[in-house]
Amino acid sequence: MKFTVEKKEISEALSLVASVAEKRQSIPVLSNILLKAEKGGLTLVATDLEIELTFKITMIELDSEGETTVSARKLADLVRSVPEDTVLTFELLESQLEISALKFQADFSTLPVGDFPVAEISEFEREVALPGKELAELIEKTSFAMASQDVRYYLNGILLEVSPSQINVVATDGHRLAWASCKIKTDFTDEKIIIPRKSAIELQKLLNLYPDNVNISFNSNQLRVFSDEFTFISKLIEGSYPDYEKVFPQGTEQKLKANKSSVQTALNRAAVLSNEKYRGVKFILEQDNLKICANNPSKESAEEEVPVDYAGDSFEIGFNISYVQESLSVISNNEVEFVFFGSENSCLVKNIDDESLIHVIMPMRL
């Protein structure tokens, strides 16, 4: 195997597949990338047995065909370190991969291609096309609310719902919930899958860099997202996602509208003196005024008043300050709306005049 390729043609794809490769070296070949050079171009593949990401690079100059596997991290780091206009030569010499450019040469150890696992792709009955940017935004607006290592394994991921007219993405860790939606025509009939946490994070990262149309297909076991450049395959989490609609609070609404940046900066200052373990913050609501208060066991405290548009009842409510901060960080509008249902019930956080994004945050006793 021997070929040459410019850094700009391979660097981005290499970084993306390297982030999928298994970092714990329990099975050494999973830390490697499969490189396959042939007439159609260069194929890069990485897997951790849950995710498989494949990239096809056509802009190479092929000298001889072949394939091998080499350390994902080391190869990505090396390519990242060379100047942008560098032309790299890859040559497989027995059990080592030689990479050279100008006066530089590196020799990498390889592992047998036969040891590299390739995903068994199931049958996919239907697929839907949508801009990668839209799916990336849905994941970005919800994934912060995913659980991590929860015994309720179905919470360690995001719910993807596809109906004939829209796609919904939902995430919850039991203390907060994020729901985002986009309108699109599909051939699906109210189908649901749960995408694992790492898969959701890697997919968002991928689609942020490839915002054009992608195709999505899935069955009960696998998700496939693909374009002309890449194919992303992920196993799914088995089981049923909880009926999240029951989490949305009911009752008399009391709406507060505010400048998002004003609330964020006040929260950031309050966070400095909040309890490091429980992360509590108190909202004191009065006519057109929101007082944000925090304290800690060292008898330190902070409070700040933020002008808001509010005509509801005066009351106090506590939250985990990190939950509010993370919610606001993915809201795109300059104006934000909090919808309260009393001091004992969850609160909604929304973009003003936008029903495609809803965050639910449970209250906290302070």
Task: Kindly label every feature range from the protein language model.
Residues 1-366:
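Structural preference for solvent-exposed beta-strand-turn elements
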